[in-house]
């Protein structure tokens, strides 16, 4: 439906299984396409990696279980509907820059001054820059964007995930970090 231009956004409501199924489908949609999940598992103690992956999926807690309409679920479901409609309306008027070569840069707190200086120079030379925070997900996003042909170059300035991987640190990548870029 997306490829045919027949939908402008996706909204799903569900419990754990419905969330797993729906968000797996949502992860196949492009970044920027409106994706909203109203879920019983969208709470502070849940791990969202499996549901959100590296995509821009908005998660809304259902508060009550998905077992009919009531004074709690009606306004929550209405908020989910409003969110996806608002996102779709916003996307209709967005002008995405095109034609410039795209360079992704990796950044974290300690490398911010360096990355911002490089970004400023690249922007001045006519490149579009995308800065991704190297919190594991950021590196994965850069790799996926490269696979999808959305970036033409990567400046991997922030490499602390390798240290995390090699020495079991907090932010750790796997051995496949940027494998699609380097190959």
List PLM regions with ranges:
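Gly/Ser/Thr-rich loops at beta-strand to alpha-helix junctions
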Residues: 8, 12-21, 42-43, 104-115, ...
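A glycine- and small/hydrophobic-rich beta-loop-beta segment
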Residues: 156-183
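Short Gly/Thr/Asp-enriched flexible loops that form oxyanion-binding sites at enzyme active sites
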Residues: 16-31, 115-119, 168-173, 177
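Cap/lid and interdomain-hinge subdomains that line or gate substrate/regulatory clefts
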Residues: 45-110
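Hard-cation-handling environments
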Residues: 127, 146, 152-156, 182
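N-terminal small/polar loop signature for handling phosphorylated ligands or for N-terminal nucleophile
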Residues: 1-6, 139-150
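Short, acidic/small-residue loops that bind anionic groups at enzyme active sites
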Residues: 21-51, 61, 130-134, 177-183
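Glycine-rich phosphate/diphosphate-binding loop of Rossmann-like nucleotide-binding domains
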Residues: 98-137, 144-147
